[in-house]
Regions:
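Helix-rich effector regions associated with P-loop NTPase G domains
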Residues: 1-7, 13, 19, 34, ...
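A structural signal for isolated positions on well-ordered beta-strands in alpha/beta enzyme cores
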Residues: 7-8, 77
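Canonical P-loop GTPase G-domain recognition
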Residues: 16-75
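Glycine-rich, phosphate-binding/catalytic loops in enzymes
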Residues: 24-27, 95, 138-142
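Short coil/loop residues immediately preceding or within conserved phosphate-binding loops
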Residues: 71-73, 96, 111
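Glycine-rich phosphate-binding P-loop
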Residues: 76-95
Length: 250
């Protein structure tokens, strides 16, 4: 976006860890970047969107008014990775289902202009991802959210990695949702932590849920899909995958 004014939306805030959301808002404020935590399902803070934009564009709007251009539409663009709720956010703003919404990446195929209230016109863009992830962990966490298409991912491995993250950061969510212990599993070493520990948790969940196949073996594929679905739809509880690194919190 170059030097153009930017408003960062922290969407799906009602599914995020509220304490970490505060950290992110503080982080962006210290960088001089305006940020707003929103949620499209509840409508939280969506009404503040126009006010934040007008604050950012105050100087530009004053210049346009001075030139007698007060009636011109203010054009803005929304960009982001796939599956973060861009279309749902637009629908909230527009008051109707103008943008197609599905819980999978790649639903918005082309650019489209949407007329909003208060003189704004918004350009909706398809979600975009980096062609390559230098940090494997970044790619994994994006895959957790569904930003990467599931049909190119190993869902069992993905669920194991997610469960390992949850064990280290939100063990109470696993225990509450699935009724299993997490504190009696020790990792073999750092290289296998996401496979060995995560797979043990996945098997426990499958056994607890009764996901069994012939011979009494655990259907770990079904367990993996269940874990990923319940993480993505918020059933597991409120959690955040990453904290800001540039700010120290004690």
């Amino acid at each position: 976006v170059g030097s153009k004014p930017r408003l960062v939306l922290l969407n799906k805030a009602d599914s995020a860890d509220p304490e970490v959301t505060v950290m992110w808002l503080d982080y962006y404020a210290k960088q001089g970047i305006t940020a707003l935590a929103t949620d499209c399902r509840s409508g939280k803070n969506v009404s503040k969107f126009y006010g934040k934009l007008k604050e950012l564009l105050k100087d530009d709007i004053e210049k346009w008014n001075a030139k007698g251009m007060s009636g011109r539409p203010i054009r803005i663009m929304i960009v982001g990775i796939p599956n973060v709720g861009k279309s749902s956010f637009i629908n909230r703003l527009a008051g109707s289902r103008l943008a197609k919404v599905e819980d999978r990446p790649g639903v918005t195929r082309g650019k489209q202009w949407v007329k909003l209230d208060e003189g704004f016109e918004l350009l909706d863009m398809p979600g975009v991802l980096w062609p390559k992830f230098e940090d494997k962990l970044v790619g994994e966490r994006l895959a957790f959210t569904g930003a990467v298409k599931d049909d190119i991912m190993d869902m069992e491995y993905l669920a194991c990695r997610l469960l390992e993250f949850l064990k280290e950061n939100y063990p109470e969510l696993i225990e509450k949702r699935y009724g299993i212990r997490t504190d009696d599993i020790e990792p073999a070493d750092e290289e296998t932590i996401g496979c060995v520990v995560g797979f043990e948790l996945l098997e426990r969940i499958g056994r607890k849920r009764g996901f069994l196949v012939s011979g009494g073996e655990i259907n770990t594929e079904r367990a993996a899909i269940t874990v990923m679905d319940e993480f993505r739809n918020g059933t597991l509880g409120r959690l955040t995958l990453e904290k800001p690194k540039a700010v120290s919190y004690t």
